[in-house]
């Protein structure tokens, strides 16, 4: 160390830093993630990470500094901080391996983490953009705060900056999937002032920019190291995310000091020594990442070179690639100030430093640090990374003593490197630690590769998923599985399963038990010391020479490869030609089409050899004269008999002067190098003609000689070859032989191309466009080309001669990088072009030599020394098939048991294939950390040195034959083999007792399938089939199938398949002959049980005679136990049958409904029983409520009846006083009342006739009355309701007329009495007609009921005849009939009965709704006094009908009810019936008098009676809800309570009715408005008519004042009655339309939901 003071670094503490700036490591990680998302964000991140100068804290809060003078203290701080901040996933793995964390929790955590990462990425991206704006504005300003000379606390633009260009920049380059503008389009000006300032301070020459590296970095490793480098890079980036800013700057400072001072200056330093030198550890707060804070109180010193220092300092700076046409911008900041010492005071010069140190401290790994000492300029190489990567390739120290003992020679190390990795530790798999333990010889980073597959390497869930579970474990741990299977075996779960299990489920449990027993056996053998983990190597057998068959197979494989590749080549050519033709047709203009064409000379007609021979037989003399001059051409033609001669091979080069020149025979130049042009008008050249004739003659002779040697099968090939040669030479001949063509040879100058040999084999023909022609006169160039071509030939002797020993992999990667950037259609690669693209300085740096020394290594970088096999040593080179030499062809047969082939022995564990190595030998405490082996441990370094390719051989061994596995014998069609179903080639020997032998084995379906597969595959080679069958299944020594067993089983299966039957089972065990004779001697009187027992005993004895094995004995015992259990089961069944009582079986002759007893009670049936019990309790509650309500209603009706009687007496007294004053009006009123008789029908068709008061006179019913009776008799429910409504509307008119008559003068008393008598007679007649009508209706009802009963009896008879299906319409069955039914038939009967009851209830609900609508519709007008009684009578009829319909249901339902519930229900029904009878017996109430005008006349009453119904309805306000509606509501509640409808169905019905009511109410309101308008018009007209009538009556009274009132002409009562009946009939026909709505409820049927069957 120099005695001069070393400059220190001022690094602020992260604890006091504001949260605004983002650390460089975070920005670097953000750049890594955004590189996968968007290219724009990548460029911005790279531009941001170019800042290497740390921010200085604000002046208001000066930090406390601690001096650290030694760079080793900084290295110690960085090392400790890195080890402290590494992630430890043990806790996460332990949590995820338990049941506390579910898959949903992991998914939600992963989703939250991804969302947070996206937010952080967007935030960091915007901060990076603001920093980029700040940097672009202030990097070249010296006096502005924020420039490299005056760094502020924050290096970014404020978030609230409102400048327009800032907003537009942030908006253009925001983070998005569809960016509008890339960050590459943002051009940064070159920092010229900054470079000048740096050059002035460093006292160096002008700063130059180093050229950018090749597309693939100079440090691109080989294929074997690429994966390790990527994994290591990802791990470093993951750790950098959790580093602090101080640690990153400390690492950069350590690198800078290492560059200046050399590797010898950095010594290991402990944490204690570091603390003594000024390094302190920042206090760790909860949730804070630990970091080291290194600060200094001394100001930053600039780099000043010593007087005797001539070493150029390389200052790292970051640059950004602006565009492909722009240069690289310089760095915006420099590294911390470093004191540069003189080279004399440095112990280890940088020029003499090792290559590993240069690569470690270089910002761009791979570039040399040994620049020329005479250079005064400063070279700034591009460096996109602020924090350098950890040195990877370090010079290996000497081997550890233990390693030297274990590995005395490289051969043992190579053997250890080829071994497989050690198995993992089962006890440490749960926490994730120790995963892939002992993996020091991994051929690929197994653990890191699994982690690198995830999109985010920092994701805790990704790490946990990779380390936990079968998917991420990588290796199966049998011991762990064995422990878990013993703790919770699947067989126990299968045995207690409550669901249906398939055969595969049972097979899983069976296999698990087999494996558990196998593992238990292994553990037992381990305990006894009989289980070995070592397997001796197979002894190599004697050498087997190849036979003729082996050579024939090789030739067949070669032919197969040739044919397949030729077919692929033809398909490829056809593909390209088709696409080119399609492109030519798509071209629109001739110019575009001309670009697809190649301008060649016109082709000539091909002539056959025979024609040429006939034409030239006459010119043999002239041909002989020129034979001596055409010998070179003959030699060339003889050597190229089988080579196709293209136009380019027969063309020669042209002279420069362009003058014609003749071809002379004595010049010696080959004719194939002459470019001959045919011209009919030119003179013939005699020499050319002779040469052509000589060529034809030589070709014919060669063809005839070859045809004689070939057999008949080769004649076609000979003709084809001759045609090919003739096609190349016939272009020179045209015309008759007596007149040779005129040939003119023209020579024109061609440009001399640069020699460019192709990287291909000579045996592969190349086209003229790919290989440029070389002049024949240039002999040195041709020789060089021949040398290069032969050098690139892929021969077996050159397979191992690669440049890996002389040329490093980095240089190879750089050299072959341009190959990957070429087009996919390029087929020729020039080595010279590759060498020209290589940078000499980069090549010198990679080779570790000076640029001036590259001339000495020219032999390595010559075009002739490059080939594909040398540039790609790790890849096999595919080339043409070359003929092997006679002595190189191996005559040894491929040994199936060699070490290169996988053995046929069962692979139990990986320890059998690996050399045992104790873990303590590896020293895990020193060489293992954080679950993986350290890269710089002695074992890893030794393994890499001994075997860099990690077991991958460097090139294939050409002496060995190709690996087996050819597709030569693969069947390419789906047709079966011809001999698949034929007889066996060799039938095995039949045993002594084949049937007994076949009965010993039980074949499972899987075994049958496997046996048939083996038989088809090995063509009935039964010995091999039996061997394979026994070796691939777990069996005992006694359960071994012989060849005959396999043959017999296949034969039986084929016979069964031919007959269309399934595979047969084992045949029965034959009985011995002696026992059979004894059985035959016995009589047939024995029962079946005795004979079966005898047979079982005999089979047992015969079974015990076979071999006396334990398996036979166990089988016989099992059969005996099965026989006894079956016998015991039969005895128990017979005892149960005798105990049961005999019942009449109605299904004796029923063959279609043989159904067994019902299954056990299911949860659904239990819930149904519970529902029935709850419904019964609910019905009982409602019955009690109804009984109480009926009692209350009875009391109220009695009180109301008393009040009505008292009121009737008072009204009678009032009528008696005023009755004498209006006899005429009373008569008219009574007549009107008689005409408004109403016939009301119930819902079930029962008509209840409401009679008028007894004082009304009767009248004979005329034809109109009879018609009205018939119409009323035939009407249904809706017509009856409409008649009731009409009656209620007509009633106020009669009452008004009666009131007007009451107030008439007393002069008409006599007439009133007479009128009253007539009304009494009329009333009696009306009552008689109504009684007759009721009798007719009652008779019709009885007829309908009788018809229904007959139908029910018929259906019941059908059900009794065939009880397979119970009809819904049948009535209730008796207990005897139900007892005869089976349980399933009873269930079916109950379901159908419930459906029929539900249908009846729905019809009843519809009728009740119609009745409610009718009663409510008549509520708006005046009602008769006895309307309530009529409604109650109608409700009574409805209730009776409902009671009749529910009798069938109650028969079954009441059986399950308790006696108290039935009695309560009967009492409630009786009370309700009594209440209805009392309501019918109640007398009618008298009408109340109305105030009439004094001048009222009989005509006025008539006119008022003729008023429409709507006027009376609109004039009278609506009274409260009548008793009729209440009764109907009560009846509806009773019906719902007695029904089986659930609460949900009732609510649904109510909602449906409510919606329909709303819709219909709106329609009714609209209709009412229209009717009101029409009624108003009619009223106006009637009023005018009434006024006219009144005026006429007054005139008549004035003219006849003395005439008494009874003498007026009035219609007789019979006419009034007929008019009333006609009006009622018309109104009835009008009401046949849908009934009017009452609060939205219509007479239309509303179908409730179908009730559930009980």
Swiss-Prot record:
Coiled coil: none annotated. One of its GO terms (biological process) is chromatin organization. Residues 1061-1071 have a biased composition (Pro residues). Residues 995-1048 form the Myb-like domain. Residues 1097-1115 have a biased composition (Basic residues). Residues 27-48, 693-702 have a biased composition (Polar residues). The keyword DNA damage applies. Residues 7-26, 49-64, 628-639, 980-993, 1133-1143, 1449-1482, 1500-1516, 1570-1608, 1615-1629 have a biased composition (Low complexity). GO terms for cellular component: NuA4 histone acetyltransferase complex; nucleus. Disulfide bonds: none annotated. Residues 1-66, 204-229, 609-679, 693-720, 883-902, 974-993, 1057-1159, 1257-1304, 1449-1523, 1570-1654 are annotated as: Disordered. GO terms for molecular function: protein kinase activity. Gene3D superfamilies: Homeodomain-like. Residues 536-611 form the HSA domain. It is found in: Nucleus. Component of the NuA4 histone acetyltransferase complex which is involved in transcriptional activation of selected genes principally by acetylation of nucleosomal histone H4 and H2A. The NuA4 complex is also involved in DNA repair. Component of the NuA4 histone acetyltransferase complex. Belongs to the EAF1 family. This is Chromatin modification-related protein EAF1.
């Amino acid at each position: 160390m120099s005695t001069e003071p070393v400059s220190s670094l001022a690094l602020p503490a992260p604890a006091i830093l504001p949260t605004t700036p983002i650390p460089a490591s975070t920005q670097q990680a953000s750049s890594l993630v955004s590189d996968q998302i968007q290219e724009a964000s990548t460029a911005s991140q790279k531009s941001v990470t170019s800042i290497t100068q740390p921010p200085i804290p604000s002046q208001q809060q000066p930090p406390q500094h601690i001096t650290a003078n030694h760079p080793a203290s900084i290295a110690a701080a960085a090392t400790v901080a890195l080890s402290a901040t590494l992630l430890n996933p043990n806790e996460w793995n332990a949590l995820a391996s338990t049941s506390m964390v579910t898959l949903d929790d992991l998914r939600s955590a992963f989703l939250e983490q991804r969302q947070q990462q996206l937010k952080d990425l967007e935030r960091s991206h915007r901060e990076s953009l603001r920093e980029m704006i700040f940097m672009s504005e202030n990097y070249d300003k010296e006096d502005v705060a924020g420039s490299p000379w005056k760094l502020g606390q924050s290096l970014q633009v404020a978030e609230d900056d409102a400048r327009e260009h800032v907003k537009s920049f942030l908006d253009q380059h925001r983070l998005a999937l569809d960016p509008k503008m890339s960050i590459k389009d943002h051009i940064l000006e070159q920092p010229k002032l900054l470079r000048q300032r740096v050059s002035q301070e460093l006292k160096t020459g002008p700063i130059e920019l180093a050229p950018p590296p090749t597309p693939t970095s100079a440090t691109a490793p080989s294929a074997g190291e690429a994966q390790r480098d990527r994994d290591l890079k990802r791990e470093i980036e993951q750790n950098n995310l959790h580093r602090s800013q101080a640690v990153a700057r400390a690492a950069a400072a350590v690198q800078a000091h290492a560059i200046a001072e050399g590797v010898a200056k950095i010594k290991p330093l402990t944490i204690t020594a570091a603390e003594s030198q000024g390094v302190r550890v920042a206090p760790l707060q909860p949730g804070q990442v630990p970091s080291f804070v290194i600060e200094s109180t001394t100001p930053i010193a600039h780099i000043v070179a010593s007087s005797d220092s001539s070493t150029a300092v390389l200052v790292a700076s970051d640059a950004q690639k602006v565009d492909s046409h722009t240069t690289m911008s310089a760095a915006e900041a420099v590294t911390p100030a470093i004191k540069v010492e003189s080279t004399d005071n440095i112990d280890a010069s940088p020029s003499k430093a090792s290559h590993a140190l240069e690569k470690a401290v270089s910002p761009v790994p791979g570039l040399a640090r040994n620049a020329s000492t005479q250079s005064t300029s400063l070279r700034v190489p591009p460096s996109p990374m602020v924090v350098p990567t950890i040195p990877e390739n370090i010079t290996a120290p000497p081997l550890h003593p233990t390693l030297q003992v274990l590995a005395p020679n490289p051969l043992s190390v190579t053997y250890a490197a080829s071994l497989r990795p050690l198995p993992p530790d089962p006890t440490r798999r749960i926490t994730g630690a120790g995963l892939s333990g002992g993996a020091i010889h991994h051929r690929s980073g197994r653990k890191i590769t699994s982690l690198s597959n995830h999109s985010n390497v920092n994701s805790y869930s990704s790490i946990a998923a990779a380390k936990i579970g079968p998917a991420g474990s990588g290796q199966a741990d049998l011991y762990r599985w064995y422990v878990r299977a013993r703790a919770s075996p699947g067989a126990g779960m299968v045995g207690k399963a409550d669901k249906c299990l398939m055969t595969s489920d049972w097979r899983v449990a069976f296999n698990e038990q087999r494996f558990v027993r196998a593992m238990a056996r292994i553990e037992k053998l381990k305990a006894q010391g009989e289980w070995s983990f070592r397997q001796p190597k197979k002894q190599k057998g004697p050498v087997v020479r190849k036979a003729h068959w082996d050579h024939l197979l090789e030739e067949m494989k070669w032919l197969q490869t040739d044919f397949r590749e030729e077919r692929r080549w033809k398909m490829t050519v056809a593909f390209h030609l088709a696409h080119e033709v399609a492109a030519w047709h798509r071209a629109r203009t001739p110019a575009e089409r001309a670009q697809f064409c190649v301008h060649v000379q016109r082709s000539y007609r091909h002539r056959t050899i025979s024609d040429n021979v006939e034409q030239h037989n006459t010119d043999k003399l002239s041909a002989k004269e020129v034979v001596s001059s055409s010998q070179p051409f003959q030699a060339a033609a003889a050597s190229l008999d089988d080579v196709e001669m293209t136009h380019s091979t027969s063309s020669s080069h042209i002279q420069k002067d362009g003058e014609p020149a003749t071809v002379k025979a004595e010049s010696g130049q080959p004719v194939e190098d002459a470019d001959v042009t045919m011209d009919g008008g030119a003179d013939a050249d005699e020499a050319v003609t002779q040469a052509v004739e000589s060529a034809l003659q030589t070709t014919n002779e060669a063809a005839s000689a070859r045809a004689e040697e070939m057999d008949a099968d080769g004649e076609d090939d000979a003709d084809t070859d001759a045609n090919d040669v003739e096609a190349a030479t016939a272009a020179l001949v045209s015309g008759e032989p007596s007149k040779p063509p005129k040939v003119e040879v023209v020579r024109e100058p061609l440009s001399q191309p640069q020699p460019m040999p192709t990287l291909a084999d000579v045996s592969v023909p190349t086209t003229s466009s790919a290989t440029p022609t070389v002049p024949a006169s240039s002999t040195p160039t041709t020789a060089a080309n021949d040398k290069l071509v032969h050098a690139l030939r892929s021969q077996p002797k050159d397979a191992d001669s690669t440049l890996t020993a002389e040329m490093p992999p980095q240089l190879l990667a750089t050299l072959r990088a341009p190959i990957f950037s070429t087009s996919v259609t390029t087929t020729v690669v020039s080595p010279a072009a590759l060498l020209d693209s290589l940078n000499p300085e980069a090549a010198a740096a990679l080779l570790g030599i000076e640029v001036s020394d590259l001339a000495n290594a020219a032999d390595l970088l010559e075009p002739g020394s490059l080939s594909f096999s040398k540039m790609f040593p790790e890849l096999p080179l595919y080339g043409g098939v070359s003929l092997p030499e006679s002595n190189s062809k191996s005559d040894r047969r491929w040994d199936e048991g060699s070490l290169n082939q996988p053995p046929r022995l069962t692979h139990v564990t990986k320890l059998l294939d690996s050399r045992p190595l104790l873990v303590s030998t590896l020293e895990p405490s020193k060489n293992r950390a954080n679950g993986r082996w350290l890269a710089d441990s002695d074992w890893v370094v030794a393994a890499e040195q001994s075997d860099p390719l990690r077991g991958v051989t460097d090139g294939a061994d050409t002496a060995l034959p190709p690996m087996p596995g050819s597709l030569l014998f693969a069947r390419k069609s789906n047709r079966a083999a011809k001999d698949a179903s034929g007889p066996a080639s060799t039938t095995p020997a039949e045993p002594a007792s084949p049937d007994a032998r076949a009965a010993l084995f039980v074949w499972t379906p899987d075994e049958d399938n496997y046996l048939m597969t083996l038989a088809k595959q090995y063509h009935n080679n039964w010995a091999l089939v039996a061997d394979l069958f026994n070796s691939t299944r777990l069996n005992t020594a006694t359960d071994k199938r012989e060849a005959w067993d396999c043959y017999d089983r296949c034969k039986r299966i084929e016979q069964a398949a031919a007959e269309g039957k399934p595979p047969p089972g084992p045949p029965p065990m034959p009985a011995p002959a002696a026992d059979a004779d004894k059985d035959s001697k016995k009589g047939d009187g024995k029962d079946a049980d005795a004979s079966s027992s005898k047979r079982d005993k005999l089979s047992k004895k015969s079974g015990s005679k076979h071999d006396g094995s334990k398996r036979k004995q166990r089988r016989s015992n099992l059969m005996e136990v099965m026989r006894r259990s079956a016998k015991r089961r039969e005895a128990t069944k017979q005892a149960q049958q005798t105990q049961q009582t005999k019942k009449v079986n109605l299904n004796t002759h029923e063959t279609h409904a043989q159904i067994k007893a019902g299954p056990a009670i299911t949860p659904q049936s239990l819930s149904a029983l519970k529902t029935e019990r709850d419904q019964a309790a609910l019905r009982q509650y409602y019955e009690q409520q109804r009984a109480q309500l009926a009692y209350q209603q009875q009391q109220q009706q009695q009180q109301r009846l008393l009040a009505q009687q008292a009121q009737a007496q008072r009204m009678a007294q009032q009528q008696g006083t005023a009755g004498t004053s209006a006899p005429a009006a009373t008569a008219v009123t009574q007549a009107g009342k008689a005409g408004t008789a109403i016939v009301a029908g119930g819902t079930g068709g029962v008509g209840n006739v409401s009679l008028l008061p007894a004082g009304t006179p009767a009248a004979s019913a005329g034809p109109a009355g009879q018609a009205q009776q018939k119409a009323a008799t035939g009407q249904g429910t809706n017509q009856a309701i409409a008649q009731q409504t009409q009656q209620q509307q007509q009633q106020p008119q009669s009452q008004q007329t009666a009131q007007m008559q009451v107030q008439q003068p007393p002069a008409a008393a006599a007439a009133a009495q007479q009128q009253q008598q007539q009304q009494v007679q009329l009333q009696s007649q009306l009552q008689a007609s109504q009684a007759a009508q009721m009798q007719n209706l009652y008779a019709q009802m009885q007829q309908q009921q009788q018809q229904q009963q007959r139908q029910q009896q018929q259906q019941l008879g059908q059900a009794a005849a065939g009880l397979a299906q119970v009809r819904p319409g049948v009535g209730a069955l008796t207990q005897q009939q139900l007892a005869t039914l089976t349980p399933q038939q009873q269930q079916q009967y109950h379901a159908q009965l419930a459906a029929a009851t539900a249908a009846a209830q729905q019809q009843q609900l519809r009728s009740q709704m119609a009745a409610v609508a009718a009663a409510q519709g008549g509520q708006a007008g005046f009602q008769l006094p006895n309307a309530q009684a009529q409604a109650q009578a109608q409700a009574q009829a409805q209730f009776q009908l409902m009671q009749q319909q529910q009798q069938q249901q109650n028969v079954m339902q009441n059986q399950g009810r308790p006696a108290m519930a039935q009695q309560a229900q009967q009492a409630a029904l009786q009370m309700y019936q009594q209440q209805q009878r009392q309501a019918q017996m109640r007398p009618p109430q008298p009408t109340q008098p109305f105030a009439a005008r004094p001048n009222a006349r009989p005509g006025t009453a008539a006119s008022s009676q003729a008023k429409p119904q709507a006027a009376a309805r609109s004039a009278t306000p609506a009274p409260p809800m009548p008793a009729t509606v209440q009764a109907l509501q009560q009846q509806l509640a009773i019906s719902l309570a007695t029904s089986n409808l659930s609460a949900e169905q009732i609510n649904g019905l109510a909602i449906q009715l409510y919606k329909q009511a709303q819709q219909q109410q709106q329609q009714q309101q609209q209709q009412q408005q229209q009717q009101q308008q029409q009624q108003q018009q009619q009223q106006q007209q009637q009023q005018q008519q009434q006024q006219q009538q009144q005026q006429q009556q007054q005139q008549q009274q004035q003219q006849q004042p003395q005439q008494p009132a009874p003498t007026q002409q009035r219609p007789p009562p019979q006419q009034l009655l007929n008019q009333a009946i006609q009006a009622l009939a018309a109104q009835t026909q009008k009401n046949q339309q849908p009934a009017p709505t009452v609060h939205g409820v219509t007479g239309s049927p509303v179908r409730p939901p179908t009730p559930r069957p009980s």
